[in-house]
């Protein structure tokens, strides 16, 4: 209700825990709860390398907002399962933190990204991907990702791939603004 009163009429929640996103969307759609239109994912799909949490992500299973996938067959299985349980979007964490390396690296290969996209698209569900690196933007756009989140460090090749393949970008400037404003304070705590 607060979001509606603030003028927000629609939003996307890319990944949720415990089926909260689809349950809230369904409650809003049924009129049981006042709120904006919601398009939601279930858990984000991560490889065992992890997302932004690196070694904090387990090698398998579900943790919070993340479902760990390690093979192409698991990717297809979990995309289908997420759609079965109400996902409007499938979210991939295409990049992740790798100990000893700076920045985030592409942690999915082309075949894995393509398998996720093909499976979701066959069931009329779009795919978004967390991409914090030039290579991830390019590869995800080329393999069928519909919405590139962040697009950090995107280069000309990545931009061309986005345009050529009809992908969209959600740059999430809030993250970068907060990093610029508060990054030095966070680094003192960590």
What do these predicted regions represent?
Residues 1-34, 66-88, 118:
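Alpha-helical scaffold segments that flank or form the walls of functional sites
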Residues 4-5, 12-15, 39-41, 128-129, ...:
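Active-site neighborhood of phospho(di)ester-bond hydrolases with catalytic His/Asp-centered motifs
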Residues 4-9, 32-67:
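Metal-cofactor-binding active-site regions of metalloenzymes
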Residues 8-10, 32-37, 87-88, 121-125, ...:
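Short, well-ordered coil/turn segments that N-cap beta-strands
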Residues 14-21, 44-45, 173-175:
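Short, solvent-exposed turn/loop segments enriched in Gly/Ser/Thr/Pro and often Arg
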Residues 15-18, 42, 94, 152:
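Residues that line or immediately flank small-molecule/substrate-binding pockets and catalytic motifs
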Residues 48, 93-190:
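Active-site core of metal-dependent hydrolases
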Residues 55-114:
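Active-site gating/metal-coordination segments in enzymes
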């Amino acid at each position: 209700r607060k979001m509606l009163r603030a003028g927000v009429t629609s939003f996307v929640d890319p990944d949720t825990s415990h089926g909260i996103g689809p349950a809230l969307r369904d409650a809003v759609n049924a009129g049981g709860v006042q709120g904006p239109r919601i398009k939601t994912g279930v858990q984000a799909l991560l490889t065992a390398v992890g997302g932004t949490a690196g070694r904090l992500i387990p090698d398998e299973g579900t943790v919070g907002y993340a479902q760990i996938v390690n093979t192409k067959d698991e990717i297809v299985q979990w995309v289908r399962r997420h759609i079965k349980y109400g996902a409007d979007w499938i979210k991939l964490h295409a990049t992740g933190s790798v100990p000893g390396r700076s920045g985030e690296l592409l942690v999915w290969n082309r075949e894995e990204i393509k398998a996720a996209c093909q499976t979701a698209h066959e069931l009329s569900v779009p795919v978004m991907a967390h991409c914090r690196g030039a290579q991830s933007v390019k590869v995800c756009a080329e393999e069928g990702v519909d919405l590139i989140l962040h697009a950090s460090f995107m280069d000309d090749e990545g931009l061309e791939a986005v345009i050529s393949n009809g992908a969209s970008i959600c740059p999430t400037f809030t993250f970068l603004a907060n990093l610029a404003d508060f990054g030095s304070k966070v680094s003192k705590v960590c």
